[in-house]
């Protein structure tokens, strides 16, 4: 096995068990509700249903990124003992955490000139798409690849990962400035579920306005067929995540599993975590898979 440490952040929205099994240490973001600060701890201290119920009832969570000091504290034990670290961050298109991570990595390099080095990669991803990229990275690492080889694989393939999502509740997107008040009012009145993606710069980008949830479910499956490697013969991994809308995500998963029978296992469904969920609110369904390279 390669002799370096692969690390990430809690915004990757995979389970605690996944990170433990794949030997990927995780540093956590934070969120705040009613002046109380909580840790985005992979739902160890709150359930997804309770968290999204708070938002549905009017709670307005605020989020904060991992600080430079927290990164230093997280990596220092590895660096001090001479272990190199490869760290993937949440997309720089939606968070400033990449910059903080780079600052912390340089500070540790200055403090431990003979110690391990930290290499930081901007994933350009979020939620379980970020988590899927980590899974592929762990596979490459476990094949015996060096840190540089693993980093090169990530950089070469990260834009082949697709991230598509829709939401039936636009209130959190309005509050976060991702859509205008007029769009939110019209969208709610017309039952529009916007189909969105993460673009090649790692930013949220609207792609299509779809009337009704039923059509959005169907269009999400069609979108995968338009971009996935090999079409119906795709044999790679597909992951989905959702924010308190299990029935909707299972409906999309059922369509995809019917249309792509060669999938690597059944579609894994995860809960959107508290960090990302603070911005989506309830009602978001997200889909992640390997496809053609994103160019816009």
Question: Whereabouts are the PLM-identified features?
Answer:
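Mixed-charge interfacial surface used for oligomerization/domain docking
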Residues: 3-5, 11-30, 97, 101-106, ...
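A short glycine/small-residue-enriched secondary-structure motif
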Residues: 45-52, 75, 80, 107
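Positions that flank functional sites
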Residues: 34, 93, 202
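Glycine-rich phosphate- or other oxyanion-binding loops that anchor nucleotides, phosphorylated ligands
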Residues: 56-92, 99-103, 147, 151
């Amino acid at each position: 096995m390669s002799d370096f440490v692969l690390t990430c952040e809690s915004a990757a929205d995979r389970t605690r068990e996944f990170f433990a099994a794949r030997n990927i240490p995780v540093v956590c973001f934070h969120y705040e509700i009613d002046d109380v600060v909580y840790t985005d701890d992979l739902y160890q201290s709150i359930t997804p249903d309770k968290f999204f119920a708070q938002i549905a009832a009017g709670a307005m969570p605020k989020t904060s990124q991992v600080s430079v000091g927290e990164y230093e504290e997280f990596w220092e034990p590895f660096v001090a003992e001479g272990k190199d670290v490869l760290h993937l961050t949440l997309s720089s298109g939606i968070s400033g955490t990449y910059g903080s991570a780079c600052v912390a990595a340089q500070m540790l390099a200055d403090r431990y000139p003979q110690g391990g080095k930290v290499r930081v990669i901007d994933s350009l991803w979020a939620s379980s798409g970020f988590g899927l990229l980590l899974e592929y990275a762990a596979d490459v690492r476990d094949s015996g690849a060096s840190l540089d080889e693993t980093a090169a694989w990530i950089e070469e393939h990260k834009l082949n990962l697709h991230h598509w999502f829709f939401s039936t509740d636009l209130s959190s997107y309005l509050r976060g400035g991702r859509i205008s008040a007029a769009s939110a009012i019209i969208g709610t009145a017309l039952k529009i579920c916007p189909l969105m993606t993460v673009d090649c710069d790692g930013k949220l980008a609207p792609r299509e306005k779809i009337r009704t949830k039923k059509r959005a479910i169907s269009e999400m499956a069609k979108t995968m067929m338009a971009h996935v490697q090999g079409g119906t013969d795709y044999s790679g991994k597909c992951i989905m995540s959702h924010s308190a809308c299990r029935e909707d995500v299972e409906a999309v998963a059922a369509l995809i599993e019917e249309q792509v029978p060669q999938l690597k296992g059944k579609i894994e469904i995860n809960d959107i975590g508290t960090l990302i969920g603070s911005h989506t609110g309830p009602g978001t369904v997200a889909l992640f898979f390997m496809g053609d390279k994103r160019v816009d």
